[in-house]
Every structure is written in structure tokens, then in C-alpha cells.
UniProtKB/Swiss-Prot annotation:
Keywords: Aminoacyl-tRNA synthetase, ATP-binding, Cytoplasm, Ligase, Nucleotide-binding, Protein biosynthesis, RNA-binding. Pfam families: SYY_C-terminal, tRNA-synt_1b. It comes from Streptococcus equi subsp. zooepidemicus (strain H70). Its EC number is 6.1.1.1. This is Tyrosine--tRNA ligase. Residues 352-418 form the S4 RNA-binding domain. Belongs to the class-I aminoacyl-tRNA synthetase family. TyrS type 1 subfamily. It catalyses: tRNA(Tyr) + L-tyrosine + ATP = L-tyrosyl-tRNA(Tyr) + AMP + diphosphate + H(+). GO terms for molecular function: ATP binding; RNA binding; tyrosine-tRNA ligase activity. Catalyzes the attachment of tyrosine to tRNA(Tyr) in a two-step reaction: tyrosine is first activated by ATP to form Tyr-AMP and then transferred to the acceptor end of tRNA(Tyr). Homodimer.
């Protein structure tokens, strides 16, 4: 199976400009290709991982990747399938985000070894050197307004309004392809399927300005079995930066994917062979309640993104919280595992009597209910049942002298911090 066949088998090929010519190029020699990442935030997220890992698969097959950070295009904003104009960031912010994205990409692509080692480029380097007049004369003249208006990404914004700034975005992205081809002989661009219009602007410019043929391959935008956009949990993006989304949160995200998605995601997001995935699928289908596919997915992706130690920690937090063994975890681990739990900052004037604290921290709605909860054995202090109505919290109840965990029943938690 050649690399293109494997990408197809994994569900990673959505659309290509000329499949036959692309397969020929990929099987007959080394292809230089690029994927672009606009710095629209200070971290990449799971949605970016599809293109990143596709790029890595091609590199492992002997092809040479260029990772383009859009220091210039990030200042403009891509209108593709956005309902409204993006808020423009300052140059300083975009340059800072560009640097952080570069660092993240180096975790996935090999920038150090072999003749096909990855290269990092930033389109700010060339756009900052070209004048507006030169850009209009040398690049803009190759694009008709009719051609630009025909793009779906533009059509969807015509009625609500699109600025000239965003309208010109596709020309800038097209010039990226031309520039990389001229300097590095890049002949293939990879991106999400929503980028098709912008990406083919590059092949059009190559054809008109240099009489060369470029290839485009898009990867699908991933949705779950219900059609919901992939990569978000409770409306929040799952970031690749551990400071924004902890390894534990990422582990839980993968652990909770639906059965109908789990095997498909193993093909897309892991480097397990297709034969290994087929074997996992067989075991998974025989005993879905054991969630083998989800557990494998969580292990593989968290290890890939954050490393083995972070995966082991996420697994340990999961197991200890499930067992209610709060004292087996450090304060740092509890902050990861209980990041979505209500947090109460204990004040100097607060009563430390357990009945009072249950009400103050929002665990019980009233003192009467708090007493009943204690008497009924529903209250747990750092994982241990507490029934003493006269108990007062002390420094001995603080894990790592930082926090105390109170639970009512099985699921209602509060974290007290000091």
C-alpha cells in the first residue's frame, strides 16, 4: 500500500486537484509540500491535528514538509465559512502567537534529521518585503474579481458583508504557494476542506505566473457521529497547549467519544497500523462496554501530544478519582482532575465548622440539609466519609497545604482553596 492509498484508507483524503498526477508524484520521488497555520490564538487545537498528523505521515513516507506559520495572513483574517469579520489582532500579538505555534509544531514534525527534515517558514518574511503596488501589479493582476467571487468562502459572506481585507485573503494564500514553489520547489499544499478555495488560488497563480502545476489535497473537517463539529468539549476548544487544556482533560475527551466514532478516530489520530486497528476493532465490537477503542485512543493521542509521563498521570488521576481516593493525588493532580468543579476561596472570617462550610461552599443549600447530609453519610472530606456535625476543618485537611475536596453523594464536588 503506497502512502496515498494509506491516507485514503484512514479517511484522510477529502479532495484533490488531480488525483492521478498526485499519486504519480508521491510514488515516483520526494515531494515537497506545505501546510499553513494562521496564528488566530496562542495555541493550536485538536482541529489542527488532522492536517498536522497527515503531514507527519507524508514525512515518514520520505516526503519533505514545510510548516508555514501565517504571520502575515494572521494579521488579515481568513473569511472561509466565518459568519462575521474576524477581530484583527496587533502585530505584536500575532508574532508572539506565531512563535508559540512554531514550538508546538516541532513536537510532531521532525525538524532535525534526514534530507526530508521539516522546515519552518513564516509568510510575514516575504509579505513584509513586498510593496502594495508591486503586489497589485505582480500578483493581483492574475486574479479576476469574477474568479474570486466564485469561491464558496466569499459567496457565503456577500450578503452579510465582507471587507476588502478579507476578500484579498485568498490572493495572499495563493502567493504563499507561489513563493514556496519558487524558493523550495514546493508542489503540494495540504489543508482542511474548508480551505479548498484559498488553496486552489495558489495552483491558479502557479499556472498563470510560472506556467507550473501545483497539487492540492484537502483533509476532511472532522465531525462526530451526530454531525457536531469535532474538537470541542462543552463548547470549549481542546487545545494542544497543556496550560490551556490539561492532559487529563484531553484524556477525558478521547475517553468519552461515542462508540460509532472511536475506530474511525483511531485511523485518523494515531499511528497504529491499520492491521492493529482492525484487531482492536474486533475486540471492541465483542465487548463495547469495556471501551477498548476509546482507551487506546486516549492513550495514543495524549502520549503523542504530551508524552508518556503526562498520559500516565492522566490515567492515574482518572483511576483515583473513580475510586474516590483523593488523598492518593497531589494538589496539582487534583487541580487537573477537578478543574471544572466549583472552587471556593476560603476567607479569613469564614467559619471552619463543617456544617457552615457545606453551605458556604455551595455543597448543601441550608444548614438543616447539611446536617442531614452528614448524618446520612453523604459527605466525604478528601475522599473519606464524615458524619461528625461538630467537625471543624484544620490545616491537616489541606492537601499539599493548598486545597480540600468536599463531595456530597457521588457527583457533587467543591474544592476549597486557601
Amino acid at each position: 500500500m503506497n502512502i496515498f492509498e494509506e491516507l485514503k484508507a484512514r479517511g484522510l483524503v477529502f479532495q484533490t486537484t488531480d488525483e492521478e498526477a498526485l499519486v504519480k508524484a508521491l510514488t515516483e520521488g520526494q515531494v515537497s509540500y506545505y501546510t499553513g497555520y494562521d496564528p488566530t490564538a496562542d495555541s493550536l487545537h485538536l482541529g489542527h491535528l488532522v492536517a498536522i498528523l497527515t503531514s507527519r505521515r507524508l514525512q515518514l513516507a520520505g516526503h519533505k514538509p514545510y510548516a508555514l506559520v501565517g504571520g502575515a495572513t494572521g494579521l488579515i483574517g481568513d473569511p472561509s465559512f466565518k459568519d462575521a469579520e474576524r477581530i484583527l489582532q496587533t502585530k505584536e500579538t500575532v508574532l508572539d502567537w506565531s512563535q508559540k505555534i512554531k514550538e508546538q509544531l516541532s513536537c510532531f514534525l521532525d525538524f532535525d534529521n534526514g534530507e526530508n527534515k521539516a522546515e519552518l517558514v513564516n509568510n510575514y518574511d516575504w509579505f513584509s518585503q513586498i510593496s502594495f503596488i508591486d503586489f497589485l501589479r505582480d500578483v493581483g493582476k492574475h486574479f479576476t474579481v469574477n474568479y474570486m467571487m466564485s469561491k464558496d468562502s466569499v459567496k457565503k459572506r456577500i450578503e452579510t458583508g465582507i471587507s476588502y481585507t478579507e476578500f484579498a485573503y485568498q490572493v495572499m494564500q495563493g502567493y504563499d504557494f507561489y513563493e514556496l514553489n519558487a524558493k523550495h520547489n514546493v508542489t503540494l499544499q495540504i489543508g482542511g476542506s474548508d480551505q479548498w478555495g484559498n488553496m486552489t488560488a495558489g495552483t491558479e497563480l502557479l499556472r498563470k505566473k510560472a506556467d507550473k502545476t501545483g497539487h492540492v489535497m484537502t483533509v476532511p473537517l472532522i465531525t462526530d457521529a451526530t454531525g457536531k463539529k469535532f474538537g470541542k468539549s462543552e463548547g470549549n476548544a481542546i487545545w494542544l497547549d497543556a496550560k490551556k487544556t490539561s492532559p487529563y482533560e484531553m484524556y477525558q475527551f478521547w475517553l468519552n467519544v461515542m462508540d460509532d466514532d472511536a475506530v474511525r478516530f483511531l485511523k485518523i489520530f494515531t499511528f497504529l497500523s491499520l492491521d492493529e486497528i482492525a484487531a482492536i476493532e474486533e475486540q471492541f465490537n465483542a465487548a463495547r462496554h469495556e471501551r477498548l477503542a476509546q482507551k487506546t485512543l486516549a492513550r495514543e493521542v495524549v502520549t503523542l501530544v504530551h508524552g508518556e509521563a503526562a498520559y500516565q498521570q492522566a490515567l492515574n488521576i482518572t483511576e483515583q478519582l473513580f475510586a474516590g481516593a483523593i488523598k492518593n493525588l497531589s494538589a496539582a493532580e487534583l487541580k487537573q482532575g477537578l478543574s471544572n468543579v466549583p472552587n471556593y476561596q476560603v476567607q479569613a472570617e469564614d467559619s471552619l465548622n463543617i456544617v457552615d462550610m457545606l453551605v458556604t461552599a455551595g455543597i448543601s443549600p441550608s444548614k438543616r440539609q447539611a446536617r442531614e447530609d452528614l448524618q446520612n453519610g453523604a459527605i466525604y472530606l478528601n475522599g473519606e466519609r464524615l458524619q461528625n456535625l461538630d467537625y471543624s476543618l484544620s490545616t491537616a485537611d489541606r492537601i499539599d497545604n493548598q486545597l480540600t475536596v468536599i463531595r456530597r453523594g457521588k457527583k457533587k464536588y467543591a474544592v476549597l482553596t486557601y
